[in-house]
Design a protein with these regions (language model features):
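Hydrophobic alpha-helical segments within soluble ligand-binding/sensing domains
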Residues: 111-114
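Nucleotide and nucleotide-moiety/phosphate-recognizing core
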Residues: 1-105, 116, 120-130, 137-142, ...
């Protein structure tokens, strides 16, 4: 069994500190804790394979634009013959407040372009996802600026908390399975 753990984000440097990059941040946190460098480049993604909690994993940050993330994920899934039960996708979600996460075994992509791309490329919604709350902008209709604009200093700790919880969720899933993670962390 090999797990594919995907964090979604935008590869360009200018987006590195934005709400839309929570998935990348979570992968970086996991990598940091286990001394893994996610720097190999293949299938339009930065990745590394490693052992985490005695499980074989690939940590992946697709380097396509967000709305093409599925292209990279699909190539990894096909090449490593990863079953949908072993796919985890981590991404930002405006319907969840900052500092909170939600773990689900399946479901629609919601309004998230990266997830839409993955669902469409894999042809299934049945894979685990960890959504990191980023909340909503005060003024409706400002969504784009909100997700890729810079984050006010005072909001960073809350968002970091969500990233930290997402990391814990991944570790819990690898150790004890998705149900256990859902019970403990949702």
């Amino acid at each position: 069994i090999m797990y594919l753990i995907v964090g979604l984000g935008n590869p360009e440097e200018e987006y590195s500190k934005t709400r839309h990059n929570m998935g990348f941040n979570a992968i970086n946190k996991i990598a940091e804790q286990y001394g893994i460098k996610v720097t190999k480049n293949k299938f339009q993604g930065l990745y590394e394979s490693a052992l985490i909690e005695d499980e074989k994993v690939i940590l992946l940050k697709p380097q396509t634009y967000m709305n093409l993330s599925g292209n990279s994920v699909k190539e990894f899934v096909d090449f490593y013959k990863i079953s949908k039960e072993e796919i985890l996708v981590i991404y930002d979600d405006m319907d969840i407040e900052p500092g909170k996460i939600k773990i689900r075994k399946k479901g629609s992509a919601g309004g998230h372009n990266g997830m839409k791309s993955i669902v469409s490329m894999l042809g299934t919604e049945e894979f685990t996802r960890i959504r990191i709350g980023i909340g909503r902008p005060e003024h409706n209709g400002d969504d784009i600026n909100y997700v890729i604009g810079s984050i006010p200093e005072e909001e960073i700790p809350k968002l970091e908390e969500g990233v930290e919880k997402a990391k814990e969720a991944v570790i819990e899933i690898l150790k004890n399975g998705v149900d256990s993670a859902m019970n403990k962390l949702n």
